[in-house]
């Protein structure tokens, strides 16, 4: 402890705030009655805001803990996005869990612990720190996936997530060991020393596979639809936004360091990443097309969005358009966080209640959305905004994000990836706009037993998400400038 200067520990204040918040919630849980547990969601928001505020106005950036982690504009931007996603997820979770009499402090504590791991992952510049952060994030999301112990789906989702996630962790750890053997260090910046050896190639492939699992890139995507569908809907929203943001942050840092070696290695890395992007965009959108479950459709579409983000990574890491591509990627992550959490919030609000309990068997079917504009016009409007953003329809945040990523790809000479991204976006628009068609142009089906959540916390979450999606689409310049500043100072 005495070997590190005080500023190293000061850099971890956002992580400490989130961790302390989790401990506070666990301790206060003992003294709260069921009627007062709603305050825990708002307390979670306070800790998230404190961590985000400190990250945004943090003192002088730099490498900390012997260059094992870094505080820079990139990590600050990622931290703010992650904390904003946590706050929205807490609001959505409060209404969803309260309706099921399942609201408990450990839900918010686990979300805070998970976000602490995500924030640390965004700062990591060392394989061991990255692995620790991944495990903190993963263990929290494993528990959250099984939080609602009713029926087989949550248990099945959590079991699949744990088993496949353990394989992912094994790939990451074994790959780290091989990279250490090849380069003599676990620091990202030192890894290129081992380039050219078989150990290095095997290690970087295994580490990339472990991270690809977290972002749900093809062919590491198989867990996504079952886990997203079986997990509690607020947890699905939290995972879809937070895990993807943190994983892409560490992926960018790792590959920016890795490509600094030989030109041959950079070319090989670009080929592999491009192949992953192509497969992920194509299969993510194709598999989403036939889905009648809106929740499962959103799960498959998240795979497609990982493909678009990979285009940004390829442009930044390999093709030399670093600043523009990173700015587009950061903007996209911010827009996607608000959009996907909002979309899952609407899906959760429509889950059917039968025989006194919520029955998810048909809760997410397209027929549940038929005529929603007449029954719940505000809810239908919010869902339409989120779907337009996911489809990349102007003037929404999703359109601006895709525009900047594909523009960076074109500027870097990656015309094939850019054109494929546009084509798969058009394909994705079909299944997104199909839901809008059901909501606005088809008559309602049997509404017997329907219960639509309308808690104040859900209303706040949806209003905030809609505002972000619309404002980032109409007045994008301030956020674009912030993303450009964050991408320009990545240490």
UniProtKB/Swiss-Prot annotation:
GO biological process: ATP synthesis coupled electron transport
Main location: membrane
Topology term for the membrane: Multi-pass membrane protein
Enzyme class: translocase
Catalysed reactions listed for this entry: a quinone + NADH + 5 H(+)(in) = a quinol + NAD(+) + 4 H(+)(out)
Gene Ontology CC: one annotated term: plasma membrane
E.C. designation(s): 7.1.1.-
Gene Ontology molecular functions: NADH dehydrogenase (ubiquinone) activity; NADH:ubiquinone reductase (non-electrogenic) activity; quinone binding
Keywords for this protein: Cell inner membrane, Cell membrane, Membrane, NAD, Quinone, Translocase, Transmembrane, Transmembrane helix, Transport, Ubiquinone
Record-annotated membrane-spanning stretches: 12-32, 45-65, 73-93, 112-132, 162-182, 198-218, 237-257, 269-289, 298-318, 327-347, 380-400, 424-444, 455-475
Family affiliation: Belongs to the complex I subunit 2 family.
Summary of subunit composition and partner proteins: NDH-1 is composed of 14 different subunits. Subunits NuoA, H, J, K, L, M, N constitute the membrane sector of the complex.
Alphabetical list of NCBIfam families matching this protein: NDH_I_N
Protein task: NDH-1 shuttles electrons from NADH, via FMN and iron-sulfur (Fe-S) centers, to quinones in the respiratory chain. The immediate electron acceptor for the enzyme in this species is believed to be ubiquinone. Couples the redox reaction to proton translocation (for every two electrons transferred, four hydrogen ions are translocated across the cytoplasmic membrane), and thus conserves the redox energy in a proton gradient.
Protein name: NADH-quinone oxidoreductase subunit N
Organism field: Anaeromyxobacter dehalogenans (strain 2CP-1 / ATCC BAA-258)
Gene: nuoN
